[in-house]
């Protein structure tokens, strides 16, 4: 059993929009033999679209909107990739994905360096001590000086770095990378093929000069000396603790430097790690199955109105058609057709091990954070909802389709696309999101998947705070006094909707015994 778990590698690829995350995912799948031709992302000349972007709206805009799950075998390893959306409006989905992975690859654009989105996501990795590998992409275009990039990575992401490959120039002068880890030179030919020319070179001989010319050879030698002098030696323990990040350079679109990244990754990345539950720590090699739902997706197949709950197996072995306990409902369920994914294509699986991600058919029984076990009462920690940044009233634009609209809103909220609050004062539904793009996605999906039309009406709100108090009388007084600001979330918890920072401050000062929370995880 342990051998099966040991060979699992489950990781997420995160980055700022357009740093080349989906291109990197495609190339990894190409090496895993999962796709024959990578769909050149967003190019209009080639009418293929990326494998991991499967929703209509993703294909139209050339961006990733939801996390895709893909798995393949590489050498002796079983690899599960989660490709996450980088657009900040979909950050909620990404935060939750990070709870289901054992390590992370961060993609950084060589010309732009570290951007805001990457910083935010890195904070979540730090909270969980997730091991990180950094891939500096687009070296075939003009890029910043590699030493400046390393300084920026250390400063912005608060982590020590150690380059394991090193670029020779960038842009039109880009010659390739030197693989410090294996002491080989990889020469660059711009093409979309899987082959790169690898040469074993002793860098202290003239062999190097013959390949890249004397001036560049001299420069490379002095840079490598500097790297050894300045950066800490690469120790796997430091990487696994989340204290040191190895750095690779390359060009995902031209498929260059990707194989080095993958080969090193499967060697050093952690197999499934223990997961914290409220009751205890769950180890992956325990004999009994446990797992939690970290994401729900409606309509992977547009012909059937079906939902799929993505479940991360935390320990033991999941077997098809075996009864498992759904802890929140306290009822036993069996799954006759659990699936594994290649973005939209899915295949039925008979068994899955710790570290795997399986899709369970869902007709409304699952919520994000639900736990499945063989009978034990367990609750896994840490799938927070953050207080939304933007709010709008959602109104029905076609009274004949009320039922479809309500069903659509329910399913989309189960997915965690946005949050729904019901105003206690007037009973109207308020949708809260992390960004403007989500409103468009909700409207588009309601119309195209549920045949329901909605319209948005503005509402001026500053923050949604979940409230609680040890003094029930004070809580009641607060709710009566602030009646026009009170709402309920989908779980029926009390939420205070402040329409300005001043209103929130005054409420906090007037009611000292009430706790105001900005995430739903408390």
Give the label of every model feature segment.
Residues 1-522:
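Structural and coupling elements of P-loop NTPases
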